[in-house]
Amino acid sequence: MMRKPACATLAVMMSLLFTPFSQAGQAWESYKARFFKPDGRIVDTGNGDVSHTEGQGFAMLMAVANDDKATFDKLWHWTNSTLKNKENGLFYWRYNPAQADPTADKNNASDGDVLIAWALLKANARWHDKGYSTASDAITKALLAHNVIRYAGYRVMLPGSQGFKLDNNVVLNPSYFVFPAWQAFADRSHLQIWRQLAQDGQRLLKKMGSGKANLPTDWVSLDTKGTLAPANAWPPRMSYDAIRIPLYISWSNAKSPLLTPWRAWFGQFPREQTPAWVDRKS
C-alpha cells in the first residue's frame, strides 16, 4: 500500500475544524456540495475522484459535529457496505471507481479505521443509538487484533495490517497517531492497551524529530533495538499530510510540549508561504 496525499479534501477538512461556530454550518454545506456524493461517498476531486477511509471518517466526524444525522447515516452505510473487509472487520483503505475492482488493494489504513470508529462513538453520544457504539466496538476490537503490536519496547499501531512489519523493523506513520480517539477508546473500553498506545506514541514522537526543523518524516522505521530512522521506501521528508500530527496532539492536549517544534517551524512563515514539505536533509 502506497498512500497518495489527498490534499484538496484534507485542506478543506482542516479549515472546517477551525471554522468559527457561527460559520460552521455554511462551511459544512459547502464541503458537502464539493465532495459528498448522494450515495454517501466522499470523493478526492484532486485525485481522480477516489475515496479513502480517512475521508469517510473525517466526514463522519464533521457530520456529528454539525448534528447532521441524515448525512452521517449515508456516509456510514456506504463505508460499511462498500469498504468493509468481512475477513478481518476492518475497511479497504481506498476505493477507485475507475478500476474494474474499485477495492483492489485489500489492505486497511489504520487511521481511517480509527476515525470511523471514533465518529461512531460520537454519533452514539449525540443521537443515543447504541448500534453506532456496537459497530465502533467491533472496529476497535479488530484494530487491536490486526494492527496493534508490541515492538522494541513500544506499543504501536501499524499503518495497515499487511506490509508494515518487516524482518528487522516496522514502519510507522506518525500522522496516524490519533491520540484523542485512542483516549476515547480507552475511556469506552477501560482497556489499558489504548492508554499504552497513546503514551508510547508520545514517547516515539519525542524521538522522531530530525533535520533543521526537528520534525518527523512522514514514514518512520523502528528497528528491533528501538532505533528510529526515516523509512527506506519513502522520501525522507515531512509533507503536508503530516499536519495531522499537531492537530491530533492539540485535540488531545493543547498545552503539550510536543507542539513546540511545530509552532517554531511553521510560525516563521507567512500563512500564504507555508512550505508544502520539509526535507530533513536540508
Label every model-predicted segment.
Residues 25-26, 49-53, 110-111, 133-281:
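Extended ligand-binding clefts on enzyme/binding-domain cores
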Residues 21-54, 64-98, 103, 152-153, ...:
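Low-complexity, Ser/Thr/Pro/Gly-enriched N-terminal "stalk/linker" regions
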Residues 1-9:
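Bacterial N-terminal signal peptides that target proteins for export
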Residues 9-17:
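Bacterial N-terminal signal peptides
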Residues 60-65, 115-125, 180-184, 247-251:
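Short glycine/serine- and small hydrophobic-enriched flexible loop segments
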Residues 52, 56, 103-125:
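Aromatic-rich carbohydrate-recognition surfaces in CAZymes
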Residues 68, 129-132:
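Residues in the short coil linking paired helices within alpha-helical repeat scaffolds
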Residues 74-78, 121-122, 134-142:
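Active-site-adjacent structural elements in enzyme catalytic domains
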